[in-house]
């Protein structure tokens, strides 16, 4: 039996977040797997912000939460942290509250922490003297 407090072991290829197309546009619904996260918390935050932004992009002015959620399920994108077990973020518990309350910009900004777009200092050249 595993200790529920012990975090999952980092997969050999690092943490990955799977982006899923909720419409019928992608084979098996998979858009891509994003890799390069510093740790599990980074992957979880990216997945959460990505879904938060996707739900907001499906929202029209004055739209009730149920309609926002229906639009997201029809046209949006989901994200899940792979191989993280219960420690990995999934949209299940958060989608409804996200649909109920419009998100502040900082809760949607997945690009600021996207490992494909941001260097986290490991390979950056030194500052010129």
Residue ranges and their predicted role:
Residues 2-33:
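Short aromatic-glycine-(Arg/Gly/Cys) micro-motifs in beta-strand/loop hairpins
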Residues 52-129:
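Short, mixed-charge low-complexity intrinsically disordered segments
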Residues 44-52:
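Mature extracytoplasmic domains of secretory-pathway proteins
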Residues 28-45:
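A short, exposed loop/beta-hairpin motif centered on an aromatic-Gly-Thr core
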């Amino acid at each position: 039996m595993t200790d529920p407090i012990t975090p999952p072991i980092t997969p050999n290829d690092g943490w990955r977040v799977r982006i899923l197309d909720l419409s019928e546009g992608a084979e098996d619904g998979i858009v891509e797997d994003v890799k390069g996260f510093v740790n599990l918390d980074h992957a979880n935050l990216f997945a959460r912000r990505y879904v938060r932004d996707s739900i907001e992009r499906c929202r029209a002015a004055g739209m009730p939460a149920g309609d926002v959620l229906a639009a997201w399920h029809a046209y949006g994108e989901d994200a899940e942290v792979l191989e993280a077990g219960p420690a990995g973020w999934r949209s299940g518990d958060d989608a409804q509250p996200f649909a109920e309350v419009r998100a502040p910009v900082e809760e949607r900004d997945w690009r600021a922490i996207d490992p494909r777009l941001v260097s986290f200092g490991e390979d950056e050249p030194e500052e010129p003297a």
